Amino acid sequence: MADETMSVDDLDLPEKARRFFAEQWGIERLHPPQKQSIEPIFTGKSALIAIPTASGKSLIAYMGILRKLLLEDVGSKAVYIVPLKALATEKYEELTQLGKALNLTIGLGIGDATSEAKKINQCDILVCTSEKLDSLIRNRSETMSNVSIIVADEFHLLNDASRGPTLEINLTKLRYLKPNAQIIALSATVGNCNELAKWLDAELIISDWRPVALEYSTYHDLHLEPRLVQSSARSSEPGNLKPPRDLVGPKSHPTWVALEDTLDSQGQLLIFVGTRKSAESEALKLSKRVQKKLSKENPEKLDLFSNVVASIEGGRQSAMADKLIECLKGGTAFHHAGLTHNQRKIIEEAFKSGIISCLTATPTLAAGVNLPARRVLVRDIKRWDDGMSRPLPVMEIRQMLGRAGRPKYDDFGEAWVLCKGTDGW
C-alpha cells in the first residue's frame, strides 16, 4: 500500500547510518511518500520526487547519497545542487552532522572564497548553488570526474525564468559528462512533472500526503473564511472545515490583528511579504504593537527577548543589525537574503525555540529553509515585476502556505491568504 510507513531499521544502509537517523535526528520511521521514493532510489534508478513542502524530501536525498557512497560506489562523490546560498548553508550544516558520524567530508560551494577550493576538490559530498556549479563545470571539470549521484533540490525552479536556465544547462552538461550518474530531483508538485521526469529519464513519485493537516483560509477585511482542509492522508471534504469567523481589531492593520489572535492562542506567525523593505517595516510595526500589548499583559515575557538582542549586539554592528534589534525588543524579526549568516542563525534558532512569536520573510524563506510555524499568512500575493504589479505564481504561494504546521508539534497548520480589495476571492 502506498500509504504505509517503514522502519528506518529495515533500510539497506550501514548500521551506523540507521543508528544516526534514529538517535541523533529522532527519525525511526519513514512517511509514506518517503517509503515510496526510497524503493526506486535504492535500486539505483533516477527519480523525480514531487511531494508537498515539509514532507521530508531532503531525507530521501540524504539516504540515497549514503547508500551510493557507502555501499554501491564506495569512493565516489555526490553533488547536491540548491538555488540559494541560505539553503546551501542549511544543507551543508545538516550533511556535516551526517558526515562526522559516517566519516564523510562535506564541501560548500557558494562563492569565490579561496578556502572553498580545497574542500571542493577533496570532499565526498559537495553542496553548491547552480551558479557555482556552472563555474566549476566550465573551469574545473575534473572536480566532476568522480561524481556518481546528483541531487537537484527545488527542481521545480527549472520553470523559473531567472534561475531555471542555469539549472537546466548544469544538468544537461552533467548528464553528458556522467551519463551513468544517478539523479534525484526534489520538487514541489508542478503541472509538468511528467515531462520533467521524462527529460531526466527518471521515475516519477508524486504524492499530496502531508505530515500535518493543513487548513487553507482567505482573510479579507478581518473575515476569515476556511476554504479547504488537506489532511495528512488526503484532501478532506469541505464538511471538515471550521466555521468562518471575524477577527477583532483595526482594519487598517490586518497583519497585527492576525498576530494578536496568534499570540492569544500561544502560537507563532510567519508572514510572507513581497520585498526585503516590506519585511523590515512590517516586523518593526508589529514589534511596537507587541511591546505595548506585553507591557500590559505579560511584562516578564519582554525580558526573554533581551538574550536574543544581546546575541545580535555582540556581532558586527550595521544598520541591518540595528533594525533587527529594534524588532527583537518586541519578539518579532525579519528574515531575508540580506542578513549575515550569523544573524540568520540567531533568528532561526530563536524562532524554532519559540522566543520569537512573529517572523516576516520574503518568499526566499519558502524555498527550502526549514522554519515552519503553526500559522502562515501570505500578505502579498502580487509582485512588482518588469514595471507592473503581477500575481505571484500559484506554486510559489503554495510553497509559502506549505510552511504552516510543525511536524511533531502541531496537529494541524493554518494557511491564510490576505486578500485586498478585489483580489478575486
Please identify what each model-predicted range represents.
Residues 2-50:
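Conserved pre-motif I regulatory segment
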Residues 39-47, 57-73, 94-96, 172-175:
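Walker A/P-loop NTP-binding motif
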Residues 66-91, 177-180:
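Conserved SF1/SF2 helicase motif Ia
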Residues 80, 96-107, 276-358, 390-397:
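Conserved C-terminal RecA-like helicase domain
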Residues 89, 96-138, 209-212, 216-219:
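Inter-Walker segment of RecA-like/P-loop motor cores
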Residues 126, 130-134, 139-183:
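SF2 helicase catalytic motif II
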Residues 172, 182-285, 333, 337, ...:
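Conserved interdomain linker/interface between the two RecA-like ATPase lobes of SF2 helicase motors
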Residues 181, 371, 375-425:
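Conserved segment of the helicase C-terminal RecA-like domain
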